[in-house]
Amino acid sequence: MLKRFAINNSIWRVITVPPNSVYLWDRTGNLTVATTDPKEHCIFVSEEIYGDFLLRVLIHEITHVVLWEYKIIEKIHMYCFPEFRIPMEEEICNILADYGRMVYETAYKVLGGKAIFTVPYELERLVA
């Protein structure tokens, strides 16, 4: 697994940790399978998850990175009452993790042969 990646010219790390690690306690005080720390530029992932679930979790956490790197988090804070900020952020990350593949697969179907040029460019633009 790649342990470093760049988004918006910032280097981020992915670190696997034991399932009871202090790094897996989230902002709401819950123990979870992964967290993202924008100050450390780090995603912490439980070493016990794998396969499709790991992929979903990584997409979710990388979406947090995108929200912070492109200052989308500031828009969430501007548009949401304080008590809804974290739930809205989580919902956005879940939407991409749960439905992102379907969106891009559908775009490929709609664009046909043109998708090979359009969809990868748009994906790169979103995370570069």
Where are the model-predicted features located?
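Metalloprotease/metallohydrolase-associated module, dominated by Zn2+-dependent proteases
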Residues: 1-53, 72-128
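Active-site recognition of the HExxH zinc-binding catalytic motif
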Residues: 56-68
